[in-house]
UniProtKB/Swiss-Prot annotation:
Name of a matching Pfam family: UvrA_inter
Gene field: uvrA
Subunit details: Forms a heterotetramer with UvrB during the search for lesions. Interacts with RecA.
Keyword match DNA repair: yes
Domain of life: Bacteria
Highest classification ranks of the organism: Bacteria, Bacillati, Actinomycetota, Actinomycetes, Mycobacteriales
Family membership noted in the UniProt record: Belongs to the ABC transporter superfamily. UvrA family.
Chief site of localization: cytoplasm
Alphabetical keyword list: ATP-binding, Cytoplasm, DNA damage, DNA excision, DNA repair, DNA-binding, Excision nuclease, Metal-binding, Nucleotide-binding, Repeat, SOS response, Zinc, Zinc-finger
Protein name according to UniProt: UvrABC system protein A
Organism per entry: Mycobacterium tuberculosis (strain ATCC 25618 / H37Rv)
Amino acid sequence: MADRLIVKGAREHNLRSVDLDLPRDALIVFTGLSGSGKSSLAFDTIFAEGQRRYVESLSAYARQFLGQMDKPDVDFIEGLSPAVSIDQKSTNRNPRSTVGTITEVYDYLRLLYARAGTPHCPTCGERVARQTPQQIVDQVLAMPEGTRFLVLAPVVRTRKGEFADLFDKLNAQGYSRVRVDGVVHPLTDPPKLKKQEKHDIEVVVDRLTVKAAAKRRLTDSVETALNLADGIVVLEFVDHELGAPHREQRFSEKLACPNGHALAVDDLEPRSFSFNSPYGACPECSGLGIRKEVDPELVVPDPDRTLAQGAVAPWSNGHTAEYFTRMMAGLGEALGFDVDTPWRKLPAKARKAILEGADEQVHVRYRNRYGRTRSYYADFEGVLAFLQRKMSQTESEQMKERYEGFMRDVPCPVCAGTRLKPEILAVTLAGESKGEHGAKSIAEVCELSIADCADFLNALTLGPREQAIAGQVLKEIRSRLGFLLDVGLEYLSLSRAAATLSGGEAQRIRLATQIGSGLVGVLYVLDEPSIGLHQRDNRRLIETLTRLRDLGNTLIVVEHDEDTIEHADWIVDIGPGAGEHGGRIVHSGPYDELLRNKDSITGAYLSGRESIEIPAIRRSVDPRRQLTVVGAREHNLRGIDVSFPLGVLTSVTGVSGSGKSTLVNDILAAVLANRLNGARQVPGRHTRVTGLDYLDKLVRVDQSPIGRTPRSNPATYTGVFDKIRTLFAATTEAKVRGYQPGRFSFNVKGGRCEACTGDGTIKIEMNFLPDVYVPCEVCQGARYNRETLEVHYKGKTVSEVLDMSIEEAAEFFEPIAGVHRYLRTLVDVGLGYVRLGQPAPTLSGGEAQRVKLASELQKRSTGRTVYILDEPTTGLHFDDIRKLLNVINGLVDKGNTVIVIEHNLDVIKTSDWIIDLGPEGGAGGGTVVAQGTPEDVAAVPASYTGKFLAEVVGGGASAATSRSNRRRNVSA
């Protein structure tokens, strides 16, 4: 096999016929400015060709079921292995997927519990066991010789009826006695039972005494009883006193409770422990573990309001508001309160009645349109029951969304959120966790953090038989948990829903899964695996990447993290600029040579020739103007109070899983969206948020796509295309033809090409070959019909304008202030290289986030806006971060507030204020470790962020020195 990976003539997207010679079995980092061509080379060229060649080796029948990829625009690639892509976009949104299921650890846990678990009765907690007839006989013969007993077959257990037919049938089969409700009767004269009472009936199969000579007879009697009673036999030891605990002993061929409690499971199989299978799933919630319930906190979001002012939110708007206010006034007459009393001051009895309903009818009075007083009596349902009823009755998606705004996902009341049947939750394994010895169910093990789960399974106490059965399974589980620990995910639990994972967490889970697969000779292409990872955990991620390399694989990592770049075997810097100014190889070689490369912007920042400066003076914080979250207790937050100063740039930091997103996104952003933007979101649990009166708008910028279809693009999303279409409609030619702005839209009939409905391409299905997209023969890819394209603005058609880069378009429309302002903002956030009409699905998460940011930036600022950004540096080069910080600081300089969740030290060190959560992730986090200026936080020994920040802000260290210090720390 060739020891080099050679690429010749790569021209995908903006690549300029790139030639590249890379070592195999190495850790290779692709870096460069955003839009320089890194992903085009790594994913769209090398990975695409590797996957295409592998799929082409399969049969035509197999290929038709696989989503194939088009052949990339490249002359040839040599030394290519089967390729695996690990990106951030394929996060599983299925509510049934968990960390345990996607890593397959849960599959092995199911096998472990099915084969080595100890079942118990969920009612009484007694151990449940199954025995063969021979085991039962041996156990009886081990008792003292001469012990007398009856062999009973329980044929009826706590059932109503007279059972006369059963007595006749048993008598006909040759049995002579039967025990009914503890009393033995002859079958020749059975008792007359009351039909409406529950009874226990056991057939007396035999009377025996313990002695060796009775072994054959005992075996026959036990087998007869087991057959008669569906696998259960009861022995009554007649020499013991009535009511004595050992007078009766129950044996079963199946899983059975010794105290006779019914079990809904016969045999334990791996599927019995699956919440996605009817054999194991809780019947109440079908294995989801949650259900929606009305939350009184959401029904009454502001307890300082009166009922007349709309304290009860579902009854405060619309044409029914007056009706419900009258109803509550009627209730007030009966209970002694009035609707002008704040909710907080209402008697507990009144609040309970409004929420849950009244037992008596209420007397409702009102004035009709003629001014006459009228009255009637009506039932008062209560707002909670009202919402549940409306939710179950409506078929309107809009109304469902409205009612769900007053509900939370709460744990299922039957399984308490564990998703499994009670019988399955009663199967345990004994082990040790955090120094405490005890038995845990599979659900309890999955609730542990991955670190604690690994400790528990390492300390399992198994007998020789169970150890022999479980040895190989435990080896697989421990191995997979070890890989998850290696990539810095020890704070997650196996029960964590996949839909709640960040892109970085999901990517690292897939990375751990790939290491667990043990494949060699594979080409792995990764997209920024360090996203969402604190500097503290970088070392373990780098060790994981090198371990994957050492197995005999080639890794190509698209990355901006300086620690990862420094530890790479080979670095490819693509640039020198972005878009049309990029697409060339600036550097291909080891790290030391990159630092000396004068043409490399990356090398300039890493060597310290360029740097992002720490501000000489930070903005002062006014303690009187703060946004304060009181009693934040969602997920792992421990009832903390956190104040966000207004009018400054605040970074929320902390290790992965410390509670940053929960605090900022789930609580603060949701409350602000509801109060300032009129949204109907469900905030995380908290007591209250103060300081809202200082603000008038929330702008939340995340990395979700700006659109799901190719018809959405930066021009349409920002709204600049509306102005461009208006310009075209104002041309002389358009006026002569009577064209309106709608004529220049590719989404509606009139101006678009109808052959391709405005897509510009035609999809040709090729069955087992990849679908082929060819330019539309009618419009030649221009999207518009011939008549529309005959209209020109300054010599350009509307199609040619959409094909311009944003930088070109900004220059083209410079005289038109209304258009230029939009485009200039896109250039300012580093998107000058993106085409104005570039389809939304082709934009990365970081690019989509910056399009949203630009869309908000061009709006008129009030100086009272709060901007919330979630890791805005994702996908950004050092130089792009500098541009982003200029934009953010411009917002703050106008009096606005910017809150960012961030791990990037360049952003953190330039912040005015830092709120550091932790100290650890998961259960070990959820508290405020430090807050203050970067210098204040750097001085806090308990803060991991402060430790790394001290190397950047402490003692006026230069950028180059601080980076050198950090690399030594990571290497340690």
